[in-house]
Amino acid sequence: MVESEEQGKLIAWNGLRLVIPQQWETIVRDKRHLIFEQDLHPLLELRWQRSTLSGDSEKKTAAILAQLEKETSNPVTHVKSSAPLGALQKIYDVAAFSLGTAGFPDGAVLICKSCATIILIRFFSGTEDWLAKESNPFQTLGCHLPQGTEPTWAIQDISFQLLEDFHLDTYTFAFGMSRILFKSSSTDVIFYRLAPASTHLKQSSFEELFRRFNDSTHPIEKSDREHSLVSRHSPHPLQYLLARLSRKKPFTWSHFRHLPEYDRILGLHLTASHPIKQELTIFLLSNYGVIS
């Protein structure tokens, strides 16, 4: 279990972090592109990237707004920053903009003064209402962690940590199943979330689910953790040689955990080109849980 933020829901995705109202839903559009909505009504859009543009903040902002003008076919004009955006000015260079003639900002370009990350914020119709009523999510917006801190991820109702050398590769957020794949130079890690677990377990046994999602024919063991299964495989020397010739990762480790109190199943599946260290599996298991 992972503790939730006191007055909201933590979202931490690929370097960006903020706390949003509990009733908001998060839609992942791309590796660095999120949309937040309530009752199927979009409210806020965030896109970000590490800066590859030359020049100072003013030149970078001008280049981004010129591109936005092409995308939207609307004239982009600078406007005065609204009060909710004011909380960002200690950390970011902030340039609010309007698409057309609206006096209220339609969004803003932020450039971090510390790491030069560029964040594009877009507001949707009705934004004025929730900015007036809700706690300001921009007060919690951050794009980098203190040096030596392992990256934290929090999406939907799960949270986990990874070592710095892993990067996001692919993801799937389907009804009842989430799958997020990370890669390093030698190891792949897949995080699974099955919800509601009770629905999946009516259709298949826990062991069948374990084998299906991990594509495993290796022996399954009972884990030391309650309601958990684990499987591990180390290849024979000839298997290892053949796997390396075909650039496959022959070492595997899988773990599935049923959390009846949350009606969730959380899974981990690792493949590696070398033996998987116990320290890594302990780290991943200890930091993977449901946000309560």
Where are these regions (language model features)?
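N-terminal targeting sequences that direct proteins away from the cytosol to non-cytosolic compartments
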Residues: M1-S292
